[in-house]
């Protein structure tokens, strides 16, 4: 299985970037960007948002992952690189059937390790 890494801009996650952090982008990594999302660019990338239409942003985020899934049917998980995207994790899972990892999930996982729940 491969991992779909979703970023604000696909240009920011180049092969050189991945190589610098020890990841071979040609081995089980698919990069999806929100470069063409008008709602994302307006709200998050310095555009002049008139309103914050989170439904539009959610739809664009899910669409980018569905497109990546179509291009690479071996995707088995999604990693949200952008800190704006975790609110859409459930929508992504509901639409794709894939588990979603993001910085909030990482914090919760580490918190559970430090403060385990008694069962």
Question: What is each model feature region?
Answer:
Residues 4, 75-83:
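Periplasmic-binding protein-like
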Residues 71-75, 85, 95, 99:
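Hydrophobic alpha-helical segments
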């Amino acid at each position: 299985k491969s991992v779909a890494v979703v970023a604000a801009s696909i240009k920011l996650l180049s092969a050189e970037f991945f190589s610098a952090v020890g990841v071979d982008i040609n081995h089980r990594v698919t990069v999806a960007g929100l470069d063409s999302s008008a709602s994302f660019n307006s709200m998050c990338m310095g555009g002049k948002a008139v309103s914050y239409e989170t439904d539009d942003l959610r739809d664009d985020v899910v669409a980018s992952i569905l497109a990546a899934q179509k291009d690479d049917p071996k995707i088995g998980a999604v990693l949200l690189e952008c800190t704006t995207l975790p609110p859409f994790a459930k929508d992504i899972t509901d639409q794709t059937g894939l588990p979603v990892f993001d910085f909030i999930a990482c914090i919760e996982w580490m918190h559970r390790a430090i403060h385990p729940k008694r069962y």
